[in-house]
């Protein structure tokens, strides 16, 4: 469960979040959509403790992020919009590092490596990986701890259509197992019908809520927008 109450964040003279209230429930995929600059990424950064709000509260499970950050963040796994890895480390090095950080066994590394099709990339430096393979590596890192709360910023970017479909299926499976899944995206056509709830951010708040099956009705411009697919 993620509960956001009265979240406010200002950068310079610009208020990006203005008393934002959001809840994301276990067993559901909650989608954040909206125009560029509406606060999607800022919201996720607040949830993950990467930036502090000017006001408001974030609770993950039953743990207040400000009062008990370690307990709150231990429940969470985060995929940033543009994952970065040390260019000289291999994909295997990256997975081993994050597994050790979480105290996970090598069997868990093997499981996510197989899940995200990374066996051939294991010994390759991340600088030599295609954009799609790097994104799958980031998704493997996200999947390592099997966390009860998943937070993803534009997870479908750089993936080819088959891997996108696999990603959506994996997130639905995680939700069925009881995970809380919070996703920010602008790929509205890709996500039409994929989520349980869709929250449209406007002027730093939730402007409206709609079923994700109605995304293309609510945002008709997405029907003609070409799919942003970068194969790899």
Listing of model-derived features with the role each one plays in the protein:
Residues 2, 17-19, 73:
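Conserved structural motif at the start of ABC-family nucleotide-binding domains
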Residues 48:
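Helix-to-loop junction immediately C-terminal to a conserved catalytic motif
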Residues 150-154:
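Catalytic Walker B motif of ABC-type/P-loop ATPase nucleotide-binding domains
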Residues 161-163:
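Helix N-cap at the start of a conserved alpha-helix in ABC-type nucleotide-binding domains
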């Amino acid at each position: 469960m993620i509960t956001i109450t009265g979240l406010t964040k200002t950068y310079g003279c610009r208020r990006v979040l203005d008393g934002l209230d959001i809840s994301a429930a276990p067993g559901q995929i909650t989608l954040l959509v909206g125009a560029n600059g509406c606060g999607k990424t800022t919201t996720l950064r607040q949830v993950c403790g990467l930036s502090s709000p000017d006001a408001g509260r974030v609770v993950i499970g039953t743990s207040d992020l400000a009062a008990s950050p370690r307990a709150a963040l231990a429940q969470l796994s985060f995929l940033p919009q543009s994952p970065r890895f040390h260019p000289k480390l291999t994909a295997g090095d990256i997975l081993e590092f994050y597994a050790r950080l979480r105290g996970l066994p090598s069997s868990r590394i093997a499981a996510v490596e197989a899940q995200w099709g990374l066996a051939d990339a294991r010994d390759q430096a991340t600088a030599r990986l295609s954009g799609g393979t790097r994104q799958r590596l980031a998704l493997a890192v996200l999947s390592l701890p099997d966390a009860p709360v998943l937070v993803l910023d534009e997870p479908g970017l750089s993936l080819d259509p088959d891997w996108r479909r696999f990603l959506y299926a994996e997130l639905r499976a995680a939700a069925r197992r009881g995970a809380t899944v919070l996703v920010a995206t602008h790929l509205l056509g890709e996500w039409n019908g994929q989520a349980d709830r869709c929250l449209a951010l406007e002027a730093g708040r939730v402007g409206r809520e709609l079923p994700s099956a109605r995304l293309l009705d609510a945002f008709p411009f997405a029907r003609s927008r070409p799919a942003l697919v970068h194969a790899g």
